[in-house]
Amino acid sequence: MASPSKKVVRKKKEKKNIPNGVAHIQATFNNTIITITDPVGNVVAWSSAGSKGFKGSRKSTPFAAQIAAEECARKAQEHGMRSVEVFVKGPGSGRESALRALQAAGFHVNFIRDVTPIPHNGCRPPKRRRV
């Protein structure tokens, strides 16, 4: 005879009041990841094109980055966030559309900084594709 199933009680995520934060947009050639943190660096909300249901080459589109940024902004606004500082990293196509989506969601953007790592002649790059 089966024992009665126990219900797992999950604690609700507490809503912190964080008025301003930092938005990190990482735009690679294959995906776009948006992370919103508090000024210290603790993650408040995150989203990516892949987590929003886009697969394969559709993850790298500007539209996928826009949808991911809107979702991330909605989660952060639930914590009372109103203004962000934006750090953009990477060469991907979702850079501008993710930034525009954050502004359209109602965030006041204090400043935008490009933090793409540029090698001072470091590792050898991968060879060119021949299609």
Swiss-Prot record:
GO process terms (BP): translation
Coiled-coil ranges per UniProt: none
PROSITE patterns assigned to the protein according to its UniProt record, in alphabetical order: RIBOSOMAL_S11
Pfam families tied to this protein: Ribosomal_S11
UniProt KW RNA-binding keyword: yes
Entry-linked InterPro entries: Ribosomal_uS11, Ribosomal_uS11_bac-type, Ribosomal_uS11_CS, Ribosomal_uS11_sf
UniProt entry tagged with the keyword Ribosomal protein: yes
Gene Ontology CC terms, in alphabetical order: cytosolic small ribosomal subunit
Keywords in alphabetical order: Ribonucleoprotein, Ribosomal protein, RNA-binding, rRNA-binding
GO molecular function, one term: structural constituent of ribosome
Entry function: Located on the platform of the 30S subunit, it bridges several disparate RNA helices of the 16S rRNA. Forms part of the Shine-Dalgarno cleft in the 70S ribosome.
Family note: Belongs to the universal ribosomal protein uS11 family.
Subunit note: Part of the 30S ribosomal subunit. Interacts with proteins S7 and S18. Binds to IF-3.
Protein name: Small ribosomal subunit protein uS11
Gene: rpsK
